[in-house]
Amino acid sequence: MSPSDVPINWKRNLTVTWLGCFLTGAAFSLVMPFLPLYVEQLGVTGHSALNMWSGLVFSITFLFSAIASPFWGGLADRKGRKIMLLRSALGMAIVMLLMGMAQNIWQFLILRALLGLLGGFIPNANALIATQVPRHKSGWALGTLSTGGVSGALLGPLAGGLLADHYGLRPVFFITASVLFICFLLTFFFIRENFLPVSKKEMLHVREVVASLKNPRLVLSLFVTTLIIQVATGSIAPILTLYVRELAGNVSNIAFISGMIASVPGVAALLSAPRLGKLGDRIGPEKILIVALIISVLLLIPMSFVQTPWQLALLRFLLGAADGALLPAVQTLLVYNSTNQIAGRIFSYNQSFRDIGNVTGPLMGAAISASYDFRAVFCVTAGVVLFNAIYSWNSLRRRRLAIE
């Protein structure tokens, strides 16, 4: 029996990719708490300049990731997903190391852009697992995998803040690079993939990729859904601490309260994603998606009327539980409507839409709060999610009618 004929232990691959997503999520969020402080340390002074550069170095990573994702997705479909995981982990480790050595803001900005260009560990992990797991377990597997990145993103800021306080800002980048290198080693030694490389001539072109989809309109609507999910999440991020301060009044531990309220949706998503993914395997991911979107709307509206931080925390916890089902449901529907041959590109296109949402969401939230007030952000976000629920329901209904 040749190595390519040996059955893949997809459960082991799921465990290792979960750990890889956890380490990647932690590595990315480790540096987030002090990003503006590092920008200041690199010589940027003045309130407006500091705000502008902090926004630029944050958003440029997502922007370049959105541009690069389709290219890496195509390469994954040609060369395999494991090699893309290795490329991403090692590339990001090297860039993080260089970030700790940056001498001025321009070097740091270029390195943040390079981080976006070389990223893509999580979408490639999703594509790898989606092509190996039995179809009837896709929802559970992708829901479980999503908790890896969420867990890392939750613990990262806490660990990053503690490390920065004890060792300074630059050493945190070196520690982050080490974490990403561990991710590279885990992937190299423990992930297995049976993949026959495809020549460039045999690769499907974009038009052929679209033609091979079972329902191209539905897949496009799922990409839009991913974008809107990230817009809805990101729109609240810039104003959350200020909104909590408005609700709490003059208290000494505002940073702790804000941090707790910021993290509760992630905790809820961590608990709900595998369970709702399993439920989606039983009743259908499309039902989970629509119900979760409607619940999100019903939770966002009262957030604009809360009177205390704890009311906001409770609503955000419930919102996180609903949101935990959204991206895994989208990814499961993408698996159902595409073939393994194009999985890398489909998941990379989805990642591009996600990155665009990560850039536009905070901009939308900041613009609305500047023009109106903090409470208006929740109402407008609820409207955007409601549009998404109607749009998604209509796309799924058309698919059902076409099948019938």
Swiss-Prot record:
InterPro entries referenced in this protein's UniProt entry, alphabetically: MFS, MFS_dom, MFS_MdtG_subfamily, MFS_sugar_transport-like, MFS_trans_sf, Mutidrug-R_MdtG, Tet-R_TetA/multi-R_MdtG-like
Leader peptide range in chain numbering: none
Gene Ontology CC entries for this record: plasma membrane
Protein's cellular compartments: Cell inner membrane
Primary localization: membrane
GO molecular function annotation: transmembrane transporter activity
Protein name: Multidrug resistance protein MdtG
Gene symbol of the encoding locus: mdtG
